[in-house]
């Protein structure tokens, strides 16, 4: 590791082979927590390249659990986290709306790393078993159109890196690659990113991973979700072509909602918020969900514009289908 640390300290990029070799050492348990933390920090300070990110992603995916699903067009909408916004679980709430709108959702997520409540925490609070066997998870997805894939269960070797991540307590390359290491080969993806200037790099990685269509979104104040109070920046990957765009709440005639308006709490509080949104109870949480679910429908290609996606999300929630999708998962993803 000495050569690697010296190279990173000199602000030199690693080759895919070099970072793959480091990743294999990490995921075999051959490096100490101190070495892993030093590696993550050195990479963060230098700045990660698409090649470095791809090398890590490939190594992690190679060792991931296999989900034997018959679903070939699955989508994920998880974000990187790490934005310190302490908002409610937006992408988790949106996943039920997207699934109710006809998209097969394989939601990849974890426990809280830098927030009060991760997706796994809030779903457990709702009675959903996040540690089922891969075969059962595949059955749930095929039968209900939605499933939650717990990252720790999908990537058991990640246990070697988790203590270092928690000790650091700040976003690292592992936040960036979390949404990229989905165990299934996704067709489409909505990826929330806490740093807008990294969007193009991640779009390049998604392209190399074979995504047909994807949207990477960074909200105001570097949120890893779209928000209704400032400018949102996104990158669209569509059949190999990459383009950028931006929007504000005013573009869609939606109300202004501040970050303070959508603060979440612990898993119990966030579970209550999620249910209230899916029951179509008016609130800033509902409006924020409509925006992000609309963006998800657009990322999937289900609609031709974000505005059409917002309208579809509104219709799906008002019809009761989104809440029904939650009930379906609660009944299916159990012991």
Curated annotation (Swiss-Prot):
Belongs to the anthranilate phosphoribosyltransferase family. One of its GO terms (biological process) is L-tryptophan biosynthetic process. Binds 2 magnesium ions per monomer. Mg(2+) 1 binds at residues 91, 225. Its cofactor is Mg(2+). The keyword Heme does not apply. It holds the Pfam family Glycos_trans_3N. Anthranilate 2 binds at residue 165. Homodimer. The gene is trpD. This is Anthranilate phosphoribosyltransferase. Keywords: Amino-acid biosynthesis, Aromatic amino acid biosynthesis, Glycosyltransferase, Magnesium, Metal-binding, Transferase, Tryptophan biosynthesis. The keyword Membrane does not apply. Anthranilate 1 binds at residues 79, 110. It comes from Streptococcus mutans serotype c (strain ATCC 700610 / UA159). Catalyzes the transfer of the phosphoribosyl group of 5-phosphorylribose-1-pyrophosphate (PRPP) to anthranilate to yield N-(5'-phosphoribosyl)-anthranilate (PRA). GO terms for molecular function: anthranilate phosphoribosyltransferase activity; magnesium ion binding. 5-phospho-alpha-D-ribose 1-diphosphate binds at residues 79, 82-83, 87, 89-92, 107-115, 119. It catalyses: N-(5-phospho-beta-D-ribosyl)anthranilate + diphosphate = 5-phospho-alpha-D-ribose 1-diphosphate + anthranilate. Pathway: Amino-acid biosynthesis; L-tryptophan biosynthesis; L-tryptophan from chorismate: step 2/5.
């Amino acid at each position: 590791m000495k050569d690697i640390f010296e190279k990173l300290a000199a602000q030199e990029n690693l080759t895919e082979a070099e970072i793959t070799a480091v990743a294999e050492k990490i995921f075999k348990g051959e490096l100490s927590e101190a070495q892993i933390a030093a590696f993550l920090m050195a990479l963060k300070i230098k700045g990660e390249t698409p090649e470095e990110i791809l090398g890590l992603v490939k190594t992690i995916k190679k060792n991931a659990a296999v989900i034997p699903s018959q679903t070939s067009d699955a989508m994920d909408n998880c974000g990187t986290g790490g934005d310190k916004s302490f908002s409610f679980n937006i992408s988790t709430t949106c996943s039920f709306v997207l699934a109710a709108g006809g998209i097969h959702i394989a939601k990849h997520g974890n426990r809280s790393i830098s927030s009060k409540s991760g997706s796994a925490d809030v779903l457990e609070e709702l009675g959903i078993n996040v540690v089922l066997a891969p075969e059962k998870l595949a059955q749930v997805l095929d039968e209900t159109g939605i499933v939650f894939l717990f990252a720790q269960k999908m990537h058991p070797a990640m246990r070697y890196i988790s203590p270092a991540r928690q000790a650091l307590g700040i976003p690292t390359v592992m936040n960036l690659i979390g949404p990229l290491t989905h165990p299934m080969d996704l067709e489409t993806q909505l990826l929330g990113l806490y740093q807008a200037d990294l969007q193009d790099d991640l779009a390049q990685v998604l392209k190399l991973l074979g995504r047909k269509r994807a949207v990477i979104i960074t909200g105001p104040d570097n949120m890893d979700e779209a928000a209704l109070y400032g400018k949102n920046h996104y990158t669209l990957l569509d059949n190999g072509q990459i383009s950028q765009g931006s929007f504000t709440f005013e573009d869609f005639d939606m109300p202004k909602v501040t970050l303070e308006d959508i603060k979440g709490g612990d898993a119990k509080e966030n579970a209550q918020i999620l249910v209230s949104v899916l029951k179509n109870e008016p609130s800033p949480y509902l409006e924020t969900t409509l925006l992000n679910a609309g963006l998800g429908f657009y990322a999937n290609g289900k609609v031709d514009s974000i505005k059409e996606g917002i309208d579809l999300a509104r219709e799906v929630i008002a019809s009761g289908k989104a809440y029904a999708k939650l009930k379906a998962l609660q009944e299916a993803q159990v012991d």
